[in-house]
Amino acid sequence: MKKSLFCGVCLCALVAMGGTSFADIMVGVGAPLTGSQAAFGEQIKRGVEAAVAEANAKGGMNGEQITLVYGDDAADPKQGISVANKFVGDGVKFVIGHFNSGVSIPTSDIYAENGVLMIAPGTTNPTFTERELWNTFRTCRRDDKQGIVAGKYMADNYKDGKVAILHDKTPYGQGLADETKKSLNENGMKETLYEGVNQGDKDFSALISKMKAAGITAVYWGGMHPEAGLLIRQMADQGLKAQFISGDGIVSNELASIAGDAVAGVMNTFGPDPRDDKANAELIKAFRDKGFEPEAYTFYAYAGVQSLVNAANAAGSNDPMEVATAMKEKGPFKTVLGDISFDAKGDPSLSPYVMFEWRKGEDGKYNYFQK
């Protein structure tokens, strides 16, 4: 077993249905529950809890109830490794998580060596599954597919303009920016600027001045919503009237809170919104009745639990390796994202990425709507 001296793990157990017993199946939830990306952690937590409650009410995994164990990775690879080691030490055999590619990739090695199957609801970097470990699955799409859509969109719509591609130097952000750049170039357009900033930066005035001087008309951001919101707001404040485009790392209502009215017209790629599927109406109402809007990765986490439970029941076993085999061979599995099958790498069969635009909804609040 790999061990780590990293500390600071926030770990607690939740009994999903009734009292804990030695026969319960422990499922770890690895996500950023604190820090700048806690909004995504909350989405994952809520989605997993709701799906586990439903699964346990229907008999759990092969008749065994599911107990959830939480690990706060704070979107930090080092803390993620600490979470993974703690999960392994506690006997967790299944993990829904992690969210960030930079956390999921190193933790997956620990899980693979210790017989733990993981299903990542938001890890989009292709490397995660391209290594073809036995235990890595995701319920989200990949950045190479996302970059194709974003790059072509910019080449088609801004061919007479100038594009800046920015990223946050993380495996997710830079990986997405690189895939988008590749697609942009393959579609006959060359970016004017390609630059990285540090995750956590708050003052982008120098970068914005540089983009203004270069005559930038479209900005692509590979990164998360905290920096995106600041970039959008500061671009408006400094008079840079360029179209802002990003990926699935900004799909949080916190983006509008940070950017303010400047968020209007911002575009991003993401999968079709499960909230638009009438089959999910009852589930959506249940979330909203509890004061929670099930945006973004809520449904991807929910689908992760559904895939795990359905595969285990199809295999007639709760052994992680047997469940992994069933996930690849016994699909499709019915989920809130639709019927999902997994290929030999652990990637799901999902519809392509589409473009969204941020604008005010009927409730007067900003949200992202499919174009």
From Swiss-Prot:
Q: What GO biological process terms are annotated to this protein in UniProt?
A: amino acid transport
Name-wise, this protein is Leu/Ile/Val-binding protein homolog 2
Q: Which domain of life, per UniProt?
A: Bacteria
Keyword set for this entry? Amino-acid transport, Signal, Transport
Job description of the protein: Component of an amino-acid transport system.
Alphabetical list of CDD domains matching this protein: PBP1_ABC_LIVBP-like
Q: What positions belong to coiled-coil segments?
A: none
